[in-house]
A protein has these predicted regions:
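Extracytoplasmic
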Residues: 14-48, 64, 154-158, 257-262, ...
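Extracytoplasmic gate region of multi-pass secondary transporters
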Residues: 33-34, 233-290, 345, 349, ...
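Conserved MFS/SLC helix-loop-helix module at the cytosolic interface between two early adjacent transmembrane helices
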Residues: 64-103
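C-terminal transmembrane helical hairpin of 12-TM major facilitator-type secondary transporters
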Residues: 303-351
Length: 426
């Protein structure tokens, strides 16, 4: 007789720490540009706006190749495709260490987006193959905790790497890229041998456990309109398009804050290393919120309050951070805002798998994420533009607050539309 909790626990311990470490590497790799910026701008003779444009080209490559990447993952399997993703993005990151000019920086940032496209939605899709729907919110939350840890760990690492300036003839910003690109390549090799594509192929599960999980997921998937062989149908599903529209504000606020936070803290007059350690604080708070909120949402019938509530708290705190003059109060509000921005996202991601499955889920989740992540492109252009136009490091937070508040309102509207169609419980 299969014990549900024991089986889920076995899968959690096999998959989640490993996927989390991959995301840790991915997120540190993605955020390294915010630390390299502190020296790279001067070294390449770029303005804040020009650097923001280059950094944001990542999201264009990411947007264009996200859906194809997830469909390839569905076809070739997680172990091979995730290995490809990590190895190629590691190689491009190492190449960024040897950027000679702005044009080269622009090209490599675009290629980095192409290389990494499909990783995050790929994991979200993979979780639908392994976990019943009642567990997915918590699993996405657990997975995203590693993004908070990446920001916490990446902050002091980024600061310390900058302080290696001159070591072995390399500038500090070059060390930032080298130290984050090489681990990605190594992790990709390990992924190929460690990761199981589906429960049916998993050697760590018994035949009874495989059968129980298969039957449970089959019951949950019965009646869904997006069939396993029709991924492209999901791309024109109105619910997918509406959810993509809702999601834009969340990455916009997240990238805007995490990209600019080191610059804000540097304005307090601290060293690079101290800057890094101070930036640990908000991400510890985010990690706690990512566990508490999704766990509560999984036990609740209505999911919308667990998405919208944190978003509104985040928007209010972002706005307040721009209104106060005390650095301590500014930083406090930004810490709470960070938690609000991230806490509801795992709950949001538990919704698409309630009406999508198979290749439809792979394509639909990727479409929502790719369109939503255009918010990152907007943030990394508008935030430095506001800074350059006003000369104020903190004023861009007002823009982020407005975008996050609008996202919260859209979630309420779309949630009601989805509920009216009786597709999912929201």
């Amino acid at each position: 007789l299969v014990q549900e909790k024991e089986l889920i626990s076995k899968i959690v311990w096999r998959l989640m720490p490993f996927l989390g470490v991959l995301y840790l590497i991915a997120y540190i790799d993605r955020q390294n540009v915010s630390y390299a910026k502190l020296e790279m701008v001067g070294a390449l003779g770029m303005s804040e706006y020009a650097y923001g444009l280059g950094a944001s080209l990542f999201f264009i490559g990411y947007f264009l190749f996200e859906v194809p990447s997830n469909l390839f993952l569905n076809r070739f399997g997680a172990s091979r495709w995730f290995a490809r993703i990590m190895i190629t993005w590691g190689i491009v990151t190492v190449a960024l260490a040897y950027t000679q000019n702005a044009t080269m920086f622009y090209i490599l940032r675009f290629l980095l987006g192409v290389a990494e496209a499909g990783f995050f939605p790929g994991v979200l899709y993979l979780l639908t193959l392994w976990f019943p729907k009642d567990y997915r919110g918590r699993m996405v939350g657990l997975f995203m905790i590693f993004s908070a840890l990446a920001n916490a760990v990446g902050a002091p690492i980024g600061g310390m790497l900058l302080d290696l300036n001159g070591l072995l003839g390399h500038a500090g910003w070059q060390w930032v890229f080298l130290a984050t690109g090489i681990p990605a390549v190594l992790a990709g090799i390990v992924t190929f041998f460690y990761l199981d594509d589906t429960p049916e192929k998993a050697k760590f599960l018994t035949e009874d456990e495989k059968r129980w999980l298969h039957d449970r997921l089959a019951r949950e998937n019965s009646g869904m309109e997006e069939h396993a062989d029709n991924g492209f149908k999901a791309l024109v599903n109105p619910r997918v398009l509406l959810m993509a529209l809702c999601y834009i504000g969340f990455p916009l606020a997240a990238y805007g804050l995490s990209y600019w936070l080191p610059t804000i803290v540097r304005g307090f007059g601290v060293s690079n290393t101290t800057n890094g350690f101070i930036n640990i604080i908000p991400w510890v708070i985010v990690a706690l919120a990512l566990w508490v909120v999704p766990a509560a949402a999984d036990r609740a019938e209505s999911k919308t309050p667990y998405i919208v509530g944190p978003a509104f708290v985040g928007a209010i705190c972002l706005a307040l951070s721009a209104l106060v003059t005390s650095p301590t109060l500014q930083f406090t509000f930004l810490c709470v805002a960070a938690a609000g921005i991230f806490a509801g996202q795992p709950v949001f991601w538990s919704l698409p798998s309630r009406f999508l499955r198979g290749a439809g889920a792979a394509a639909g989740i990727a479409a929502i994420n790719s369109v939503g992540n255009l918010g990152g492109f907007v943030a990394q252009n508008v935030v430095p533009w506001i800074r350059d136009s006003t000369g104020n490091d903190i004023l861009p937070m007002v823009f982020l607050a407005i975008c996050l508040a609008v996202a919260g309102v859209l979630v309420i509207i779309v949630g009601r539309m989805l509920a009216a169609r009786q597709a999912i419980s929201v």
